[in-house]
Amino acid sequence: MSVALRIALDRDPDVKLGTLATAGTALVVALLAAAAETPARGLHLSLAWPFLLVGLLSPGAAQILITIAIRDSGASRVSMVLGTAPLVSVTIALVFLDEPASAPLIAGAILIVAGGVELARERERPAHLNRLGLAYAFAGATLFAVRDNLVRHLAAGVTTVPPAVAATAALLGGTLLVAVWAREGIGRRWVRFVPAGVLFGASYVSLFEAYYRGRVTVVAPLVAVESLVGVGLSALFLRESEHIGRRLLIGAALIVAGGALIGIYR
């Protein structure tokens, strides 16, 4: 999604339009998935409101931050920062949930920090890179981590809301927040953001399906692989503008390894 969104933003750098069009398209994809799931699992709309509220955090506020970050700092580096979400998730658990610390968790945290250091030590950076965009990306990753824990908490409870319906509710809440923030019509320019929106919608539904079936400690590290995928696709499709170097690749690998270590031993 990040690479497709970067390609669209290169053509039209309007962040408000891009965020609204991407979230709106993702909502349509989720609605189609929910419609396909309904005959077998039902709707249970009256119980979906907690997911609507979760959507205000992510994709709502998070998607605004991520779109700004991708415009200002590029897809590859933002994807790399998003890979730190497992570290944020564990930090939340240690500080607020009193989960015990362990050597593997500390080692995973060190690997993720080392990946961030590699990113900071880059010598050849694109001219358009804005470090503030990386801060936006980390804020988005923090909201992702909060979202992941909330969704898993809701899914592990007694909810009867199907995954696709839950994802639709979250995307609806997020899209409404984005629409209030953007305060503008989509117009005809939204078409260039459709590929990013389709990928976003498909990934969001898949994410909810995963959290309904597995723990955060298993799913979150798998999602962190996005760092490597994002860097790889950026090198393939955005080679001239992204300037993918050795340090960026090493940093992405360290972050994914750290996230995996945290997930396995948490």
For the regions a protein language model found, what residue spans apply to each?
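Juxtamembrane helix-start motifs in multi-pass secondary transporters
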Residues: L17-T19, V78, P163-A167, V219, ...
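Hydrophobic alpha-helical transmembrane segments in multi-pass integral membrane proteins
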Residues: V29-A40, V88-L105, A141-G157, F200-T217, ...
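Structural signature of hydrophobic alpha-helical transmembrane segments
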Residues: G42-P59, L97-V113, A156-G174, Y212-S227
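Juxtamembrane helix-loop boundary signature in multi-pass membrane transporters
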Residues: T84-T142, H153, V231, A235-L236, ...
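Membrane-interface interhelical linkers
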Residues: S2-L53, Q63-S73, R121-Y136, G157, ...
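Residue-level signature of transmembrane alpha-helical cores of multipass secondary-active transporters
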Residues: F51-G55, T67, S79, A109, ...
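Alpha-helical transmembrane segments of compact multi-pass small-molecule transporters, enriched
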Residues: T25-L32, V81-F96, I110, A169, ...
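Residues that mark transmembrane-helix kinks and helix-interface sites
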Residues: S2-V3, P59-I66, V90, V113, ...
